[in-house]
């Protein structure tokens, strides 16, 4: 190395080697990234690079050294503090929370005696938009229309609100640049959160580093917008981690153009719940898995790449139904299998990514596995909990294959069996979908039920478990759906224990951010 080398030296030869104390692993800044150089002959030897897992280890070392600092380049905490201490933001928050109890489930305000007060609070929201607008110059058209929609709501006598025009102009997908903030004002419900279409105010930060933009060229998903919370009203002080246009109150369905995923909330609650499960179950973890639990920024990176691949998978493969299931009423295990299919496909894709040297591939596998096993089944109530059922299916399959053991109140994995077992489950779900193309809807529901019950026992009082000849197959499909119990597939004894001991911890993740 040159005497004035300004990079980092990670490994050197020993003092007695020839040459002594020579650098064999170094890294330095290169434009916006890092360049890593390894003297591989001194680490493995040219004749042994293909032995054992040496080539994989070499790629892992390169990936690890190229990371540099794992901290984000920007201070989100400061950005949040500036917004949340702003008088305009505080005034808007107050106005929103004062409006909340006046609104009906559909967003309207029926009691005319409250209209005067409501108009005052909506005007406060409009004032706040005008004061904050200079901070969002890229949203000038949207914010102008949002004010018009709010004024139209007042003029309508607070009928069901209609934000169609402003929603058409709210396009975060057109500005997917790292650390770009967006202000959103809509009457909306929040998925897995507030079921009512209350007026909400939200400020988001786009999480779009260069490496993710490059990955999106391979995994094209133009509607995908990973975001972080900067500020939000209480409609998001819950478990909701998504921001979708279909949640907004509009007079007609708007074309699907974007979908926001709060990667900071996803990562933070994952880390908290899995760490709790690790302690409770005396779970020994590989170093990489522990690293994921210990590092919020790494977890966010992991979740955005998982989400990018998962989201696009909904429209790929053998699809015996509308993959997004919009306004379809089906037994809830159909939704469970669809979400699970996309996660399993993502899990498999990490094997391709890993072969290409992607540093996040192994972390995505741990994230999918642990989120599915530990958080999903005990989050939310037991009323048609389709995400929870997906986790129950994964547990049952891994347990059946001997890749997972729960003995002496301790959970262990046979890691050498895990990947093959998950891929096998993915193949089984794919086969179910492939064969479903030749079935009627009801026949596919029945085949899917039989697949699930092969792993997760149904409720003893299940109507469906009595046999297909007991189903009212001659009537409307809704009659068969109505026979599905709210908790058709109850938690097993493992999850009953996990829920009893970790339930409070899961509840404590309500409203969590990074």
Feature map (PLM): residue ranges:
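Long, well-structured alpha-helical subdomains associated
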Residues: 300, 351-453, 458-459, 465-466
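Extended, compositionally biased alpha-helical segments that mediate assembly or anchoring
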Residues: 72-203, 435-514
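Active-site recognition of the HExxH zinc-binding catalytic motif
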Residues: 303-319, 347
């Amino acid at each position: 190395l040159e005497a004035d080398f300004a990079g980092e030296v990670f490994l050197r030869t020993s003092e007695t080697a020839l040459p002594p104390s020579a650098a064999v692993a170094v890294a330095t800044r290169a434009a916006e990234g890092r360049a890593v150089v390894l003297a591989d002959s001194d680490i493995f030897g040219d004749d042994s690079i293909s032995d054992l897992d040496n080539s994989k280890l070499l790629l892992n070392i390169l990936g690890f050294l190229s990371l540099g600092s794992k901290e984000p380049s920007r201070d989100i905490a400061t950005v949040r503090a500036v917004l949340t201490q702003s008088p305009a933001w505080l005034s808007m928050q107050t106005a929103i929370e004062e409006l909340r109890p006046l609104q009906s489930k559909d967003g309207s305000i029926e009691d005319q005696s409250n209209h005067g007060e409501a108009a005052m609070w909506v005007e406060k929201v409009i004032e706040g938009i005008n004061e904050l607008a200079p901070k969002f110059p890229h949203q000038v058209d949207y914010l102008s229309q949002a004010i018009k929609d709010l004024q139209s709501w007042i003029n309508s006598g607070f009928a069901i609100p209609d934000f169609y025009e402003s929603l058409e102009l709210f396009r975060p997908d057109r500005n997917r640049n790292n650390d770009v903030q967006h202000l959103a004002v809509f009457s909306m419900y929040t998925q897995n959160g507030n079921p009512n279409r209350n007026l909400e105010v939200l400020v988001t930060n786009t999480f779009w580093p260069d490496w993710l933009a490059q990955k999106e060229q391979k995994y094209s998903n133009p509607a995908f917008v990973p975001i972080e919370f900067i500020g939000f009203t209480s409609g998001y002080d819950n478990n909701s981690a998504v921001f979708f246009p279909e949640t907004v109150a509009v007079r007609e369905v708007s074309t699907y153009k974007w979908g926001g995923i709060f990667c900071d909330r996803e990562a933070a609650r994952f880390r908290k719940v899995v760490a709790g499960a690790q302690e409770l179950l005396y779970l020994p973890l590989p170093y990489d898995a522990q690293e994921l639990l210990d590092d919020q920024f790494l977890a966010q990176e992991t979740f955005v790449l998982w989400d990018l691949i998962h989201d696009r998978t909904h429209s790929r493969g053998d699809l015996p139904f509308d993959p997004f299931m919009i306004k379809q009423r089906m037994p809830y295990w159909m939704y469970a299998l669809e979400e699970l299919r996309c996660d399993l496909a993502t899990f498999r894709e990490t094997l391709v990514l890993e072969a290409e040297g992607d540093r996040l591939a192994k972390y995505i596998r741990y994230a999918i596995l642990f989120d599915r096993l530990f958080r999903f089944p005990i989050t939310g109530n037991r009323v048609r909990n389709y995400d929870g059922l997906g986790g129950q299916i994964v547990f049952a399959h891994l347990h059946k294959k001997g890749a997972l053991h729960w003995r002496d109140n301790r959970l262990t994995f046979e890691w050498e069996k895990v990947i093959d077992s998950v891929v096998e489950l993915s193949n089984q779900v794919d086969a179910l979908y492939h064969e479903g193309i030749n079935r009627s809807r009801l026949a596919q529901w029945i085949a899917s039920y039989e697949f699930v019950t092969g792993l997760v026992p149904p409720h003893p009082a299940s109507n469906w478990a009595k046999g297909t000849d007991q189903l009212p197959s001659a009537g409307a499909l809704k009659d068969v759906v109505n026979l599905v119990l709210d908790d058709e597939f109850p938690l097993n004894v493992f999850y009953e224990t996990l829920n009893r001991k970790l339930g409070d911890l899961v509840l404590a993740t309500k409203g969590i951010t990074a």
